[in-house]
Each structure stands twice: as C-alpha cells, then as structure tokens.
Amino acid sequence: MANIKSKQKAILYNQKANAYNSAVKSTVKTAIKKAKLAADQQDAKLSDFVSKAHHEIDKAVSKGVLHKNNGSRKASRLDAYVQSKQQ
C-alpha cells in the first residue's frame, strides 16, 4: 500500500473505476452473446437483441469505457455475424 495520502486515494479511485468498467464490459459482452445466440436459433426477437447490444455498446463508448473504434468494431462484427446467419 502507498504511504502518500493522495496515492492511497488514487488507488481507491482506480479500484472503483476498474470495478465499474468491468461491469460495463461484462454487460456489453452478455448483450453480444445473447444477440449471437438469437441469430443462431433464428429467434423472432433477433432485432430486439441486436438493438439492445448496439445500445449497450454505444453507452459504453459514450461513458469512455470503450474506445470509439473498439465500439464500432464490435457493432460491425455483430452485424456481420447476424447477416451471415440470416442467409
């Protein structure tokens, strides 16, 4: 543990930020998995799952958890996956 008070506070802040970022990333991954599963099963609510995944990705990008390009890549790959399963 750090000896300087400001560094102790910084460590606590970083731990909180890490927990938040991990939770948001987990939510994004779960939404993508659900959308892919719906695409595999030809689910009737596929568009709902895909839009939910896009919403979670966009929210993570706007909060600064994911980089803009990373979010775009995730959304693009999800769309390509869904498109390949619909053919």
UniProtKB/Swiss-Prot annotation:
InterPro entries, A to Z: Ribosomal_bS20, Ribosomal_bS20_sf
SUPFAM superfamilies, A to Z: Ribosomal protein S20
This protein's UniProt keywords: Ribonucleoprotein, Ribosomal protein, RNA-binding, rRNA-binding
GO BP term (any one): translation
Region (Disordered) location: 67-87
Keyword presence, rRNA-binding: yes
Organism superkingdom: Bacteria
One matching Pfam family: Ribosomal_S20p
Keyword Ligase included in the entry's annotation: no
Record GO cellular component, one term: cytosol
Family statement: Belongs to the bacterial ribosomal protein bS20 family.
Protein name as it appears in the record: Small ribosomal subunit protein bS20
Classification lineage: Bacteria, Bacillati, Mycoplasmatota, Mycoplasmoidales, Metamycoplasmataceae
